[in-house]
Amino acid sequence: MTMNSSIIKNEQAYLDLLRLVLNEGTEKGDRTGTGTLSHFGAQLRFNLADGFPLLTTKKVHLKSITYELLWFLNGSTHVDYLQQNGVRIWNEWATSEQTARFNRPAGDLGPIYGHQWRNYGATTTADGQYNSDGVDQIAQVVEQIKTNPNSRRLIVSGWNPGEADQVALPPCHTLFQFFVADNKLSCQLYQRSADLFLGVPFNIASYAMLTHMVAQVCNLEVGEFIWTGGDCHIYQNHREQVELQLTRSLYTLPTLALNPNVKDIFAFNYEDISVDGYESHPAIKAQVAV
């Protein structure tokens, strides 16, 4: 596969990208000391009418994806909400050793995704906390989709260069843009750093879920989710897992169901979101690089 070949959509495109990076990626060092095979610049397209893009070639933990997205939308940056709901995906970055790097207590991840989405550019208090005087980008973009759907400014940015060194992990999925055409809502994500085996399957499902949620509250149908990656990499200690995944056949994608009574993007609860018909191969364990 080359990156300018004919467009292949949905999960097969993801598998083709894994194969490309595994076979042709450049060996590079990285911040974690693990080492990667890397490829710069890739795009995957998922037609959301074909199903919900939750990978079937390995089981993906939907509960973690759903709670994390609700956590982002709530504007929270502390892991207590996740941990109370049995989600551990941020634990490695929430230790006292990690948070001491930017002078915060254990569990406080700093101004990461939720803060940037809901309170971008907020001023700080004397104790280093944030006032509620920033830009609520989510509320703003939903209102713009409703009132000015032809706008080319339907953008949310998680990347704040002035705060990128004040967080447990600078945002990997940095910016997303919505697009409305023919009464359908599409979303494109730009991900600066893409851990193809562990992280990207979560990111694809999370932003596809968000697209469904925003579409519902804006009375639109869903169109495409488009994932665009910058540094697309496979960690050296994930190579065997990737090779195993590439031996597996595809199942039909499941469908996402939302409680149709929810009309406010901030009113969704975990129980309002479900996936039907998810059939997959078993999970494949791998170590996260911190």
From Swiss-Prot:
NCBIfam families: PRK01827.1-3 (NF002497), thym_sym (TIGR03284). It catalyses: dUMP + (6R)-5,10-methylene-5,6,7,8-tetrahydrofolate = 7,8-dihydrofolate + dTMP. The active site is at C172 (nucleophile). One of its GO terms (molecular function) is thymidylate synthase activity. HAMAP family: Thymidy_synth_bact (MF_00008). Keywords: Cytoplasm, Methyltransferase, Nucleotide biosynthesis, Transferase. GO terms for cellular component: cytosol. This is Thymidylate synthase. Belongs to the thymidylate synthase family. Bacterial-type ThyA subfamily. Pfam families: Thymidylat_synt (PF00303). Homodimer.
